[in-house]
Amino acid sequence: MSEVYNHHAVEPKWQKYWEEHETFKTDVWDFSKPKYYALDMFPYPSGVGLHAGHPEGYTATDIMSRMKRMQGYNVLHPMGYDSFGLPAEQYAVTTGNHPAGFTEKNIQTFSKQLKELGFDYDWSKMIATSDPKFYKWTQWIFKKLYEAGYAKHIDMPVNWCEELGTVLSNDEVIDGKSERGGYPVVKKMMKQWVIDQQAFAEELLDGLNEIDWPESTKEIQRNWIGKSTGVEVDFKIVGGGEFSIFTTCIETIYGITFMVLAPDGDIVKGLMDRVENPEEVQAYIDETLKKNDLDRTDLNKTKSGCPLKGIYAINPVNGKEVPLFIGDFVLASYGTGAVMAVPTHDQRDFEYAEVHGLPLIQVITNTEGTVDVTKHAFEKTEYLGKGCILMNSEEFNGMTVEDAKKAITKKLVDMGVAREKVNYHFREWIFARQRYWGEPVPCIYKEDGSIQFLDDSELPVVLPELEDYKGHGGQAPLENATEWKHYDKNGLKGTRETSTMPGSAGSSWYYMRYIDPDNDKEFANQELLKHWMPVDLYVGGPEHAVGHLLYSRIWNRFLYSKGLSPVEEPFKKLVHQGMILGENGIKMGKRFPEFVVNPSDIVEEYGADTLRLYEMFMGPLEVSKPWNSNNVTGARKFLNRVYSFFTEESNITDENNGNLEKVYHQTVKKVTNDFEALAFNTAIAQMMIFVNAVYKEGSCPREYAENFIKMLSCICPHIGEEMWQILGHDDTIAYEAWPTYDEAKCVEDTVEIAVQINGKVKATLAIGKEDPKDEVIAKGKELIADKLEGKNIVKEIYVPGRIVNIVVK
């Protein structure tokens, strides 16, 4: 397109300038200025490159970085790549080529696209999680987690995906299928590396109160952690054996009419030689093992089960025998693997009892005794805090629920069969994958079965090249590395771990490595960490709420406990950008490639500054919004208009007649405040008001013009630099001082007030703020003179700055 502003010439020119002059290289040792650390969630370098949704969040941090630099901050704004991942591995399996080459090619593509968009990244700080210089320290931190007892190697049920040949974490499973590929996922018992998340639960919950994050994300994490305070009670089994349950509703214990055990738990295994229906029970267990946790709980529409015929538990409060069942909705890996069932006060139990013909015992009612539990349960949301009382509960009859909770707990504790306890919903973080393209676990399985981690001097343990990158028969691909797998060195003999770490390993601490990426003595210098942490602004998608955003907090908490992180929380402020949808409102991405808008196409036709301006003007940053090609054209027209005016020498004056004073100061104020609030769309709207005003005036004082260009350059850096140079400056605009405003000059001189007759608005009147009362009333009466004809004025009322009210008869 032929335009006044030639982006094809201007944008490459300034990108070359920034690179050659290292304009955005941060001296991390410069402690003379306040610091500002802006960070984007780093991307996985896929083969398809960026789509138009990617630049939105990146532009937001770029604007903030540029403004803070002008405000005198030492800014760190790095970029890197979360470069371990399944697509590269699938490429290796398909082609036989090492995934490193595929990954490096993709990184180059991504970096080229990001540079074309004009972001002020310090590329000298770039990291990639698949770089051995980086994952040496991922391995080192994992070793420290193991030495501290937080990383463990245990038997546990895992989410197994046969098609991918690997274990998946809970957040990688969606609706019973793998997040990537949509393949079936089943439960399987395996030895697994796990990290004990529960050890950090209280610190994670407390920390949420100290950080500026979206409340919705904090609530998601609270629910995922799932803290509940209750009582753990021991139940003996008739004929020998016992198990425990955890309950937050101890007040209902007299209403137990059955109990349910996890089909795949150890309790049931110990009863198989005593049940009267072993074939039926085993068949149910086998079916359960085909399901994942979501199938068994969240997605389970009807609660299935199978009786353990002939097996009964004894209720410790009254000695009554209750039948035992197995049900797939009870998970061996959560809580104790057993639950008590009170059909009258839990709707799930009520439905289960209906299906299996089990009795109902009501133990809570209102003070009138009018609660009916024959059609549905009377649950805790209905009775807690409502003055309800116990019934059918022996000596606790007539007590309020709240008093009975304490009294029943005391009785059971005194009997030695119960203890107060805190439970958490989230479980161990599975920290191993049967894949090749991930960090090797730096340990050896010795011949006696024990585990020994390698000395720090042997880190990093580097991935070997393979002829076959596919695992076979459920084994990890590294099983194919026969020579590498067998270890015999310095008196230590054994086999290496052949599972690798998950993709979430490197991303759990990468924000620290940016600060000191070339350090080969420690993961980052402690003095630098103390100065730069925490991250001041972190921008990324909400889909990472219980994955990366939780894992990062866990790793940071661990490092903090060891004196290796200076802060309790890694990310001070978190913002989720909304999705940019296709023109038809469908999400851009690999599922619908036909709706993807390629940013390179927009940059080619309209320029990077147009793309940046358009995406920031689409609407609030946090809101999802559809792409609109017509509005892209509108953004470009605005830039042409700006360029045309401010590069015309005759339009820029060294004198100031005061006509633009108010709109200028209002613009500086609003843009400054809106940038701080990340309200870029309204900041741009104010810039447009200013541009309209200067066009109307026909000229602009040099001070106002230059300061406007500074502000615009944060959003549109190429055109900003170009106009700055045309106005006679040799150096980059990036380090110029941010403009200031005079509050007194932002105030409107006039206000609009209502003119009323007998309290009803008849007109509006523009008046000066300092106009005297008599003058305002006179103007108001003059404005509505035709409506006052023939009326007798009884009273004239003036509320300063608001209304004139003429009372008539």
Question: Model-predicted segments: where are they?
Answer:
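Glycine- and acidic
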Residues: M1, M41-L50, D122-I127, L331-V339, ...
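NTP-handling and nucleic-acid-processing catalytic cores
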Residues: E3, H7-Q15, T138-T365, G473-Q475, ...
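Helix-rich, typically C-terminal accessory recognition domains appended to large enzymatic cores
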Residues: D82, E147-N159, G335, E420-G449, ...
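Conserved phosphate/anionic-ligand binding catalytic regions in large, soluble enzymes, centered on
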Residues: F243-G265, W429, R435-W437, V441, ...
